[in-house]
Amino acid sequence: MENQTGWPDQLFDVLKGADIRQVGYVPDAGHARLIARCKADNDIRDVVLSTEEEGVALAAGAWLGGQRAALLMQSSGVGNCINMLSLIATCRFPFLTFITMRGEWAEFNPWQVPMSQATEPVLTAKIGRAHV
């Protein structure tokens, strides 16, 4: 994977440097390059999820098993995680997620707009803080 350019490659390097060993995701065009990099790396277990909330449980299980995990999702996926996000605050484990935003300027799908507007408030309410 030579000629690295762009944020997906930079983020991949950060994940590797932080010893992230599991990456969960629902297939997403916004994260396609990052997903491809994770799949190609034998040190990272890429986990295709049925729904984003499974990624919260994946991260918890990884932490309990002595590994670090990350969840990749779209802003609409945050809505799918609302109940499961309580696990993070209650059990106080670290949670790393990277969210591609939908429903912002020039969004072609109006159904994406409400969750886009709610993403940061939901994360703040459920886990106490969100770094955007």
Identify the function of each model-found stretch.
Residues 1-129:
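Thiamine diphosphate
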